[in-house]
Curated annotation (Swiss-Prot):
Keywords, ordered alphabetically: Cell membrane, Coiled coil, Developmental protein, Glycoprotein, Glycosyltransferase, Membrane, Transferase, Transmembrane, Transmembrane helix
Organism: Caenorhabditis elegans
Primary localization class, coarse: membrane
Family per record: Belongs to the chitin synthase family. Class IV subfamily.
UniProt feature coiled coil, ranges: 1280-1335
Protein name: Chitin synthase chs-2
Domain of life per record: Eukaryota
Cytoplasmic side: 1-116, 198-212, 264-271, 323-347, 509-522, 598-1045, 1096-1100, 1158, 1397-1440
Subcellular location: Cell membrane
Comp. bias regions, Polar residues: 1628-1639, 1647-1661
């Protein structure tokens, strides 16, 4: 049954301003026609006549087509999202306005070049550092085990000890070897001790899971076997191996991983080949069990020990080589068990690490006992000096005498030097405190050191028994044909070598981890791990050959008796390669490379945590390279299948430049046609791995922003839209999986969006109209062409209204218009709106599967924005990286840069810089950030949905302090709730965003007046709950709580500190007494306090400006006073050191932030403003704590529109406190309203006017006529009018109108939801006339009604509640003001009194004493020529409290400076990880298709989807003319070309531009394809022939074989590509099968989209077709 539509005639661009009856629900056909943008001037909706439609909707009208008897639906092209409507343009209106210049999003060429150089240098440093440290660690460890094997052997050493002999030998005893045993044990135990410390720290300060008994016992058994295997290899086998063989054997430690790799292999096409290679690796690894003893006969005794130790060692890494996808069920079970073990490893290894150290000690004593006695191992001071006898054999008498003469000369020379130094030392020392002489001289004999006689000889006096005498030994012994030279070994050389070896291990681990974090794993980790053993073998074999040739080789680094074992390693390189042992080792090396092949294909995210990189929390000092390679996780990230990357099926009514039939079919294996998104949201209605895709909801809150501020925020959203569309197109059409892919949706919540017109109806205010006007400008600025977005859809909602825009990238932008009379306004309630809408309604209500809810919530993020923020997509990537890195991260914020003009903005630039450089960085490093600013922050949905977060955030402020804590600092309170629930908040310095800062003094003070009390209240709330916070939040320790307490105390005492500083500076600068200086400074401060407590806010701000200017001038005296103080006290005085430390820390921080170095320039303004900002501002904030108005961007309503609100009693929206300080405290309550609706007052005013006019008219014509009109008050009643039969018709009509309005007024008083709730006048506003009307889904409308009723209904307060609130706020103000002033006054008095009386009570500063040298005659000896020198030393005297607080502030500064250094290193890592290296890429000609597309997919998609130039020929594309000379601008030609182009439809969506270029690309066509400018072609990837061929081939593989036929009749700009012609034929059949859907009748057309006419034809007939 057909419904008759509105028959009012409308113009061509006229909108339907009428509204349907609220009680009448339109039927489907009517609503569908409206939803499609169709309008009928008369008649009814026709039935579906396919034949007639097909005839009448061709490219041109057929003359034989009969005149339709019923209206024909003409599609509303005005609402097509892909092209702009051709409006009627006058011939004279052709002058152009160029789009604004593009924003400078990057940092310039030199910045990018420096990042490239930095990344290259990092590649090189990491490679060398990891490889070098791994080689050093392994070599030095083998050196220690080789030294154990030298025990009891006589070795040949360098003949430099006894140079007269041809050969020097030494016999190493157990006393010489025992130190290397302990050194080896320490080298094994040090990493385990470090693991114990880390595990205990995590156990004590973080909330980690406790293992079950079975899990603990299982890990204990495995690690025990592993430790026994290490002990056998190190203490039993290695001492008997030469160095080269020992290094080679470390490649045979992956027998168990080789077996597990086979049984964990996932079945696939190449599984058979992979299994064959796996068995080959097993065979290669098992060869170490039998081959090594066979080729080395001396190892026959270790025939059993070698396979046992290697197998036990390889057990440790079993967790990394079992997979859940294995075909064997036991392996899958074991993999799940391993996953649970990883979650509980901290508490497990807190005990296991100590247990392993005990195992190492037992193995040491067990296996070394066969080489030496236990008594030798337990000797005292095993690392000390030991006597070593070096023998020179085969010497004749002449050589012996020459040796004796040389030694005696050396001894005499040593004695002379010892006596000289002893005499000099004795002269220096006081006579009563002579230390004991040490007669152990060091004698230099060539290049070694020798001690003779006694090591210690006690002096014949005191302390003789404290240092016992050691045995004496002769310097040398002479025999018949040889001599012995006795010398002491170097003390603690083994201990130093252990420290050096552990340092190399430590560096290797952290450089490897850093390489993995910054996405340099192949070059910085995998390659060094593969090369470490070959390089070590090469190094050791070279050293052995060199030692064979020269016995003195290496003695300049090592002691003469220390070197590697080189049994049979002195062969040449050719002989070494040809030995069977070398070939077996190469098999081990190849098998290890295959088993650790996962190192070359990392899949982890940037800056991944150690737990995500390594399976075990420890590494082995003996072979750190193998332990790290096997410990590196294989499965880092869940794989997202390409078919799960779903995209919306495109509707033909919403797509213009598409391939026929393609809109309902997606490319093969890229999109899934079986699923869609819920209500145009980002959540799919079926489970898939795509649930883990990052979803970003940008939620901005707006109020009274200017047009420039709105444009900045909108440009940021359009940048995100463009970036997301490029990534979507790259995946959709280029079949590339982008690891950084995300889905995006934008919401803007507009507070106070409505005004009330003269009829009491809501109408959109000037700010809403402003954003509607600037949205096209923002899009034009981003896309660098004149853009005109598709008109929005407008809908009436329970909270006001909603505008829905489709951005050029097909992402949606929702503008929610809030009516203060229907819903609470202000920023916190807007945040509650989108929390409940996006997380409560869309996620929790629409998704049924709980597991899906958890996955989606962990990967859904809300990007909170202010209405004036400006950012880039790269800044969002960095925050998302932090979120992916840490699952417990609840929020992340970036670096905020204030923008604007004026001195206040310059001050804030420096203030923001110091706050971020030092304070935020410190919070990030030692705990977590306390406040994530709402202007640019990323919140995790999972954290916001947790208990006591979103629900508590929606609480209504009941107590007076709630208004301060909850509503004045909503961002900080939300972060406080996250911290109390155990989530972490982080800061990323590389994520930049700009926001407009207050430019005026008053606005700045009002902003800080909100921030300071809310900050103090939230910190105090956190400190009160510190026990719970420390318990549940692993990022917050008791030390961080103490740090926050210290910062709170410093903030409270800040005004007093500045006050004392000014007093001292004035006193020193003007040489006046301290008390006089106190009076001078106190007068303006006291006056300001009195003004703040008594005067109006406007007068307070005037007083603050005046006094602040006076103190700024006095700060010049502070400069002079500080300089005089520094000169008087010296550079080592505490004040000087503090001043230098502050200046140095600021300058260093600026140098470490080179891109922000200019922020330090306004430091002078910051210095002059210190008294104003750190003394006056806190006083102003505390004294106005009861004032809870917003204070910034307040736009007072016009007087005529505010009259009603002022007359309304009890209405808290405007208040009446403009001149009453008592009521100033309630101005913020603009959400509330009284019992009388403002509309009632409007009606009363209009009724009064009507009655007055009627009375005047009546008195004029009928003076004797008695009238009476009773207009009751707004509390109730009706108007009663006595009608007279003598009244004429006009009078009767006026009376009836007045009566009708009276009755409506009475109804309004009974129901506050009267006409304002039903009115749709704002929908007919001129700014929205082109917008299409839509209606909310019933379910969504029900949601909004419920959430408003429960949480967001406007606040209604009666007089008593207002009085109670006012009294409570004033009481809080009074109490906190008293506390604040008393604490500072006590502090000031204490410091000043102690300063005055510091002669009596002081602390002497130990540094920088001053000396006064006086020479006076000495009369005691009656000799006038004798003079006496008097030295008087004076030290600086400090008052105790001043010194304590100086140390207090210095400690804070040191902590912040060190934390800033650590944070800068982390930021550097983040920048390096995010920087893409271009210089080593293959050239385009050398890249294969897959490599080309994979490396440049997003950039190619971004170039293909560019809107600029898409509708023009290559030679007609407008290039900017402002840089050209006047003679070359071609003004007339450009204007003519522009006029012609204005008559054409313009593509307005990125998808359509991409498809048009993508399907038109052909390597057979001209090198300048349609839509590309000939300018800068060399810089475009898509214009290169290699790129075009690769894209063409990729397109064919996705969409079918190309048809090479050309259509010469088609112009180059609209030429159909080969794929288009092919796809047209492929989808012809499907096109004929299209049927009407629930959204309305779809038009069937055989015409091609690119051949559509520029204007729709109209037919002549009785029915007039119109579009709206």
């Amino acid at each position: 049954m057909m419904n008759t539509l509105d028959h009012r005639p409308l113009g061509r661009m006229e909108t339907m301003e009428g509204k349907p009856d609220e009680d009448e629900v339109p039927t489907s056909s009517n609503s569908d026609a409206k939803g499609k943008g169709y309008y009928y001037s008369s008649g009814t909706v026709p039935t579906d006549d396919s034949t007639l439609e097909e005839k009448c909707q061709q490219k041109t009208f057929d003359p034989s087509c009969p005149t339709p008897k019923t209206p024909v639906i003409v599609p509303n092209r005005e609402f097509d999202p892909n092209f702009s409507t051709v409006t009627e343009n006058k011939g004279w209106d052709i002058f152009r306005l160029l789009p604004p210049k593009p924003d400078r999003l990057g940092h310039g060429f030199w910045h990018d070049a420096s990042l490239q150089v930095l990344k290259l240098a990092t590649f090189l440093v990491l490679f060398l550092l990891t490889l070098g440290s791994a080689v050093v660690a392994k070599s030095t460890f083998i050196l220690m085990t080789s030294a154990i094997g030298w025990g009891g052997q006589t070795i040949t050493i360098c003949n430099q000890v006894i140079s007269e002999a041809t050969q020097n030998t030494v016999k190493l005893k157990n006393a010489h070897v025992v130190k290397w045993v302990w050194a080896t044990l320490l080298a094994l135990s040090a990493p385990e001790a470090l693991c114990f410390v880390r595990s205990m720290h995590r156990t004590m300060f973080r909330n980690v899971k406790r293992p079950t008994f079975i899990q603990f016992v299982f890990v204990l058994i495995i690690e025990t076997f592993h430790s026994i295997g290490v002990g056998i290899l190190v203490f039993r086998i290695f001492p008997d191996l030469d160095a080269v063989t020992a290094a080679q054997l470390t490649n045979a430690m992956c027998f168990v991983p080789a077996i597990l790799s086979v049984i964990s292999r996932k079945p696939n096409k190449s599984a058979l080949l992979l299994v064959i290679i796996d068995f080959a690796a097993i065979a290669a690894q098992s060869s170490g069990f039998w081959a090594l003893p066979m080729f080395l006969p001396n190892l026959q005794k270790h025939l059993v020990a070698i396979p046992v130790s290697l197998t036990l060692i390889s057990l440790a890494w079993w967790q990394n080589f079992v997979h859940r996808d294995s075909v064997f069920p036991p392996v899958r079970t074991l993999a799940k068990f391993a996953q649970r073990l990883s979650e509980r490893r901290s508490k497990t290894y807190a005990f296991v690490s100590l247990w392993k150290i005990c195992i190492y000690v037992v193995c040491c004593f067990l296996f070394i006992s066969s080489r030496m006695k236990i008594e030798d191992m337990l000797q005292k001071d095993p690392f000390g000096e030991k006597l070593l006898s070096v023998a020179g054999h085969d010497m004749n008498q002449t050589q012996i005498e020459k040796f004796q003469l040389r030694i005696n000369q050396m001894i005499e020379q040593a004695n002379r030097e010892a006596g000289f130094y002893a005499a000099a030392e004795k002269k220096k020392q006081p006579p009563k405190k002579q230390p004991k002489a040490d007669e152990a001289e060091q004698v230099d004999a060539g290049e070694y050191m020798m001690k003779r006689f006694k090591r210690f000889i006690g002096d014949a006096g005191e302390n003789e028994e404290e240092e016992p005498e050691e045995e004496e030994f002769s310097s040398y012994n002479i025999y018949s044909n040889y001599v012995e030279r006795n010398q002491l070994t170097m003390a603690y050389d083994a201990l130093w070598l252990v420290i050096f070896q552990f340092g190399a291990v430590f560096v290797c681990y952290h450089s490897s981890k850093f390489a993995c974090k910054v996405m340099m794993q192949r070059m910085g980790f995998a390659l060094p791990m593969a090369l470490s053993v070959p390089v070590t073998v090469l190094l050791l074999s070279t050293n052995c050959r060199m030692r064979q040739k020269d016995s003195c080789y290496g003695t300049n680094v090592l002691t003469v008796e220390l070197f590697w074992q080189c049994n049979g390693a002195s062969m040449s390189l050719a002989d070494f390669i040809l030995t069977p042992q070398t070939w077996i080792w190469l098999c081990w090396l190849a098998s290890q490379f295959w088993i650790t092949i996962h190192l070359w294909n990392p899949k982890h995210e940037r800056l991944a945590k150690s737990e995500k990189l390594f399976i075990l929390p420890y590494y082995i000092g003996a072979f750190v390279d193998q332990s790290l390679a096997f410990n590196r996780r294989r499965d880092d990230k869940a794989k997202i299948k390409a078919e799960d990357l779903e995209f919306d099926a495109e509707d033909s009514s919403l797509t213009y430049e598409t391939i026929p039939g393609l809109q309902n079919k997606t490319p093969p294996s890229v999109c899934s046609a079986s699923s869609s998104k819920l209500e145009n949201g980002l959540i799919r209605d079926s489970a898939s791995s795509a649930d883990a895709i990052t979803k970003i909801y940008a939620c901005a809150t707006m109020w009274h922003e200017t047009g420039v501020e709105m444009t900045c925020m909108l440009k940021s959203l359009f940048r995100m839209d463009e970036d997301q569309c490029a990534r979507r197109n790259a995946q959709k059409y280029l079949k590339v999986i982008d690891p950084d892919y995300y889905e995006f949706e934008a919401h803007i919540f507009f507070d106070d969006a409505y005004d009330v017109n003269e009829y009491g109806e809501p109408e959109i205010n000037k700010f809403v109209k402003q954003i509607v006007n600037v949205i096209d400008q923002a899009a034009s600025a981003v896309h660098q062409t004149q853009m005109r977005l598709k008109p929005p859809k407008k809908a009436k909602t329970p909270y006001g209204g909603k505008l829905t825009y489709i951005m050029p990238g097909k992402n949606k932008l929702f503008i929610h218009l809030k009516d203060n009379q229907k819903i609470r306004h202000r920023k916190r309630w807007s945040q509650v709106m989108y929390l409940y809408y996006l997380l409560g309604y869309r996620l929790m209500m629409k998704v049924d599967d709980p597991s899906r809810k958890e996955i989606i919530s962990e990967n859904t993020f809300i990007l909170t924005l202010d209405g004036d923020v400006d950012f880039t997509p790269s800044s969002v990537y960095l925050l998302v990286d932090l979120m992916k890195k840490n699952r417990r991260l609840g929020a992340a914020c970036g670096r905020i840069h204030p923008r604007g003009d004026g001195a206040m903005v310059w001050y804030q630039k420096f203030e923001y810089a110091i706050g971020h450089w030092l304070q935020k960085a410190t919070e990030h490093m030692i705990g977590c950030v306390m406040c994530s600013p709402g202007c640019f922050s990323l919140f995790r949905a999972y954290a916001l949905m947790d208990d006591n977060v979103a629900r508590r955030y929606a609480l209504k402020s009941e107590e007076p302090k709630h208004f301060i804590q909850y509503d004045q600092g909503e961002d900080r309170w939300l972060c406080t709730l996250l911290l109390q629930r155990g989530y972490r908040v982080e800061y990323c310095a590389a994520s930049d965003a700009q926001t407009f800062a207050p430019e005026g003094f008053n606005e700045f003070f009002n902003q800080r007046r909100r921030w300071i009390p809310s900050t103090i209240f939230n910190i105090m709330d956190l400190l009160k709950d510190y026990r719970n916070v420390v318990r549940v939040n692993e990022s917050i320790s008791i030390w961080y709580i103490i740090y926050q307490l210290v910062m709170l105390i410093s903030s409270i005492l800040g005004p007093g500190t500045i006050f004392v500083m000014i007093i001292g500076a004035i006193s020193i600068s003007f040489s006046i007494d301290t008390l006089i200086s106190l009076v001078i400074v106190s007068i303006p401060v006291v006056v300001f306090i009195v003004v703040c407590l008594t005067a109006k806010p406007e007068h307070q701000l005037i007083c603050a400006q005046t006094i602040g200017a006076i103190f700024a001038m006095l700060m010049t005296a502070v400069v002079v006073g500080t300089s005089l103080q520094l000169q008087k006290d010296g550079l080592l005085s505490p004040h000087s050191m503090f001043t230098v430390a502050v200046a140095t820390s600021f300058l260093t921080a600026a140098i470490l932030h080179p891109l922000e170095f200019t922020c330090i320039i306004p430091g002078t303004i910051y210095f002059l403003a210190i008294p104003c900002m750190y003394m006056l501002l806190p006083i102003y904030s505390v004294c106005n704590m009861h004032t809870v108005s917003w204070g910034t961007r307040e736009d007072p309503r016009p007087t005529e529109k505010n009259t009603l609100a002022k007359k309304t009693p009890g209405n808290l929206e405007s208040g009446d406190g403009a001149g009453n300080s008592e009521n100033w405290c309630t101005r913020f309550l603009c959400c509330g309203r009284g019992t009388v609706h403002p509309m009632t007052m409007v009606i009363n005013e209009k009724l009064n006017e009507v009655i007055k006019k009627v009375d005047r008219l009546d008195r004029k014509h009928h003076p004797s006529l008695a009238r009476r009109a009773s207009i009751l008050s707004s509390t109730g009643g009706t108007i009663q009018i006595d009608k007279c039969s003598e009244a004429d018709e006009d009078e009767q009509a006026e009376i009836e109108d007045a009566l009708e309005m009276s009755n409506q007024s009475h109804a309004a008083k009974k129901n506050q939801k009267w006409k304002q709730a039903q009115s749709e006048a704002w929908l007919a506003d001129k700014a929205l006339k082109r917008a299409e009307r839509e209606y909310l889904e019933p379910e969504e409308e029900s949601f909004w009604n419920d959430v408003i009723e429960r949480y967001l209904s406007p606040l209604i307060m009666d007089g008593k509640d207002m009085d109670r609130l006012r009294a409570g706020l004033i009481a809080i103000r009074n109490s906190h003001t008293v506390y604040f002033l008393m604490i500072n006054i006590v502090f000031i008095i204490s410091v000043l009194v102690l300063q005055i009386h510091k002669d009596c009570l002081n602390i002497e500063w130990p540094l920088g004493p001053k000396f006064n040298h006086t020479v006076r005659p000495c009369y005691a000896n009656h000799d006038d020529n004798q003079k006496e020198e008097v030295w008087v030393m004076t030290r600086l005297q400090l008052e105790p409290i001043g010194l304590v607080f100086l140390i207090f502030f210095v400690s804070i500064l040191v902590i912040q400076f060190l934390a800033m250094l650590c944070h800068r290193f982390g930021t550097l890592a983040h920048i390096i990880a995010s920087t893409e290296l271009f210089c080593f890429r293959k050239t385009m000609d050398r890249l294969s298709e897959d490599e080309l597309v994979a490396q440049n997919a997003v950039e190619i998609a971004r170039e293909l989807q560019a809107i600029r130039g898409i509708d023009e020929n290559a030679h007609n594309i407008d290039n900017p003319t402002e840089d050209r000379g006047i003679s070359r601008r071609r003004v007339v030609q450009n204007l003519e070309s522009s006029r012609k182009s204005m008559m054409k439809r313009k593509t307005e969506t990125l998808d359509a531009a991409f498809k048009k270029r993508f399907f038109a690309l052909s390597s057979e066509q001209t090198p300048d394809p349609a839509g590309f400018s000939a300018r800068d072609n060399s810089k475009r990837l898509t214009l290169r022939k290699g790129t075009i061929r690769a894209l063409e081939h990729r397109r064919d593989s996705l969409f079918g074989t190309l048809d090479n036929r050309k259509d010469d009749e088609v112009d180059a700009t609209s030429m159909r590509g080969p794929a288009q012609r092919r796809l047209e034929r492929l989808f012809t059949a499907q096109q004929d099968q299209n049927s009407p859907t629930s959204d309305g009748n779809r038009r069937k057309s055989n015409s091609r989209p690119w051949d559509q006419p520029t204007s729709s034809a109209t037919s002549s007939g009785d029915v007039e077709l119109r579009r709206f």
